[in-house]
Amino acid sequence: MFAITAITVFSAMMLTSNTKAQAAAKKTYTITPKSSPYKGKYKKAKGYYNSTTKQYFAIRSYLELLEKKGGGKLVIKKGTYKIPNVLYIPSNVTIELKDGVTIKKIMKTKAKKMKPGGGIFELLEPSKAKKKGVYGQYNGVHDVKIYSTGKAVIDQDYQGKTGQNCIALVMCHNRNVTIEGITFKNMKYGYF
């Protein structure tokens, strides 16, 4: 019994050590309200990319990159980010909202081929966003942390039952999710 316990503890210590090493190797990316999408992705997407959707596509491109890299950290610097559609967050991702960040839901895209969506963030790999039934039980996105280093706001910009109604964060079949230090504003109807 003691030997099995020692092996179990040792295995857990090795797993923790490997996990810490992997986390340390994951890259950190930083964006501002003026940032362009990663490596220009989406900038030539006619009918989608414009001055209204620029911030959405900038954040989206980095979340897609983090999915491909197996995780990492996205630091969002001070400013207002207008989000017309859902941003999908993959596993092993940390999003740090710096002091003074506002994530504001908008319901206009000014894009011919892109309609606004009803949410802001969803814990789902971007590559699986259009697929149905990809998760069940607790096998969804995991190990996600969204936090603020000061005062950060997610503004759902509720406009009444006949106007805009938005879901700030959709979580289904997820585990190890941490949300800290963020003010959720203007959620008068609907869900968190």
Protein language model features and the residues they cover:
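Active-site-proximal or metal-binding-adjacent scaffold patches in catalytic folds
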Residues: 9
